[in-house]
Amino acid sequence: MALALAGGLATAGAAVAATSAQTAHLRHENFEQMGDAFKRVNDELGRGSPSKAKLAADAARIQKLSAQAPSWFPKGSGKEVRPKSLTLPAVWANPTDFANKMKAFQAEAAKFPRTVTAGDMEAIKAGAKSLGGACKACHADYREKKS
């Protein structure tokens, strides 16, 4: 019985580790998608006549991902399961500050699609800048600098 219980605990521990590793990988993949969407927005805004349809698609993508982002940071999903992770331990050490910054980012991400839909290009540019600033607010304290 004890051996079966120990085996069950080992299996449960492995499942949690696999889930944490999967979450860390998912977090990376989703932030890559978000970064790509930000790049497309900025590239589009740099064109002479930006496509509002392209901006709207990327704004919606950023909003959707931002709504999911808080679930990408469960305890145990840092470097301990994904050594290449850029997520700093401060995410879990300072959960209230991290959550507040995440909420501010989500609020900007929720506003941006409406700004794009309204169609005022100057407001869209200002909204993109504000959204980028809210995104970067987490980077200083919660993301390792890329080498």
Briefly describe each language-model feature range.
Residues M1-A2:
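Bacterial N-terminal signal peptides that target proteins for export
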Residues G7, A12-A15:
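N-terminal signal peptide c-region/cleavage motif recognized by signal peptidases
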Residues A21-K54, A60-S147:
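Sequence context surrounding c-type heme c attachment/ligation sites in exported
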